[in-house]
Amino acid sequence: LTYKDEPVEAQDTETEKHGKTTVIAAPVAGEIVPIEEVPDATFSEGLLGHGFAVKPEEGRIYAPFDGTCLTIFDTLHALGLKSESGVELLIHVGLETVDLNGAPFKAHVKSGDKIIKGQLLLEFDMDAIRAAGCPTITPVLVTNEDEVGSVVVRDGMIIVGGPEISEASMKMEPQAVAAGE
């Protein structure tokens, strides 16, 4: 995992596993934090994958790309997503939130659902999470880095690149999709 300051240009295009580019919108609005600064070794040491974390400004998780919801945990604290290009992400809302048994969460998708970029996937009550003594910092990890190549975070964006996916970038400002579009 490397961090770069130079801006990155990316195109918002359909993606295939070989050579095209995809823009991946941020799943949650907030301040980006290097994954190494997450106060949980499971995330900070890259045991589940590399990426970044976000200190959320609001309690909403949006689809960062078109693809599929691979899994939503029974406790609703985490989502596994797969883009049409094959990038797999784990979005883990807060730390130790598995112990909250789903109470502060409301899912808008289920495992196996197709998702579209900007679609609301999950809502969470940040005050309830904090009241339970859990940090709200939200790790966002590429879990199949071995298939997509290196993970580089640049100036508020995450870049996934390698021999099979030439580039995918994660913008840090989610946009909701209007109903009916």
Predicted stretch roles:
Residues 2-181:
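Contiguous, well-folded functional domains in the mature portion of proteins
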